[in-house]
Amino acid sequence: MKPLLVLLLLLLLDLAQAQGALHRVPLRRHQSLRKKLRAQGQLSEFWRSHNLDMTRLSESCNVYSSVNEPLINYLDMEYFGTISIGTPPQNFTVIFDTGSSNLWVPSVYCTSPACKAHPVFHPSQSDTYTEVGNHFSIQYGTGSLTGIIGADQVSVEGLTVDGQQFGESVKEPGQTFVNAEFDGILGLGYPSLAAGGVTPVFDNMMAQNLVALPMFSVYLSSDPQGGSGSELTFGGYDPSHFSGSLNWIPVTKQAYWQIALDGIQVGDTVMFCSEGCQAIVDTGTSLITGPPDKIKQLQEAIGATPIDGEYAVDCATLDTMPNVTFLINEVSYTLNPTDYILPDLVEGMQFCGSGFQGLDIPPPAGPLWILGDVFIRQFYSVFDRGNNQVGLAPAVP
């Protein structure tokens, strides 16, 4: 027993040391752009202006032929954090996005309406800035975000990455970024996703020995007023944010944080992926998305119907709606209706939108299901680059 006790004490000491080395980035929760537009009665016009029918969506996304991000992924984003670039620091609000790998912020040279509505980066005001000069382009829906690549210090809650290459956008498409609560995006995906061959921020954190462990983790609070307690943690994970033990799931392709699904169950019936399919765990997507034909069946199964271009349910039926369970690595991850239905107040009336959305991701990248914030709110998520695996456990409210 004595050697076992010593081993246990050593493990506890290692855990305590790892806890002390955690770098926590607070995430603030804001009203999503979709809710803003819905409250202003402008959501239908937004669909029309972007040529989108959200009830029959098949927006193509193929990251292997070009760097392409579905624009609608950011329509429902609610969790944001702060970073700084340069010396002295210039602050920006960003989405920490595991579904992409580039860092970009608006440039002072940008003339798009979105840049006029957000802070912009001034390279001439940073003593540590280096011009790289390469061009980059990321496709968002039907428009491109384009710019040049520079290098500078990037700081995230006490972690300072030297010589980080990042995108300075000079053109941003559409109205989505105009009204967005965020200024830019910090990608946490694998290097193979990065436009312009840029080394992602977290890879540089590891290379510069800034993190104790080669992993980061995400906790998204369900608190609708500000998301109190939500955080991104670099260098490890915090056991106080989840119950039980982590289930470790191998990454099947090192681009997105892609894992295998064993099945998707609605109520007591496995409706999808009965022979297995692929999914990504993505902090840069608010909803849960899947192939449009499968999502249409899922909407019907939960009783959701099209209303003003999106799916919603009668708020009075939540008690009778089915659970939706994702079977992953022989473990069940169950969402009850209050988890996957998104309440809103529109002109004094309760609105209950569906947390599921159709999104066509064709081969070779797809088809894919995306487990976005609707899923991550319920399951604490650890992204382990050292072992190329994702850890999931029930989140503690």
UniProtKB/Swiss-Prot annotation:
Which is an annotated Pfam family here? Asp
Positions annotated with a glycan in the UniProt record: N91, N323
Main localization (coarse): other
Tell me where in this chain the Peptidase A1 domain is found: 79-393
**Keyword Disulfide bond listed:** yes
Disulfide bridge positions per record: C110-C115, C273-C277
Provide the reaction this enzyme catalyses. Answer: Similar to cathepsin D, but slightly broader specificity
Q: Where in the cell is it found?
A: Endosome
EC main class here is: hydrolase
Gene3D superfamilies, alphabetized: 6.10.140.60, Acid Proteases
Please tell me whether the keyword Lipid biosynthesis is annotated for this protein: no
Domain of life, per the record? Eukaryota
Q: Provide a GO biological process annotation.
A: proteolysis
Q: What is its EC number?
A: 3.4.23.34
Q: GO terms for CC?
A: endosome
Tell me, how does this one assemble? Homodimer; disulfide-linked.
What role is this protein assigned? May have a role in immune function. Probably involved in the processing of antigenic peptides during MHC class II-mediated antigen presentation. May play a role in activation-induced lymphocyte depletion in the thymus, and in neuronal degeneration and glial cell activation in the brain.
- Family statement: Belongs to the peptidase A1 family.
What's the protein here called?
A: Cathepsin E
> Which species is the source of this protein?
Mus musculus (Mouse)
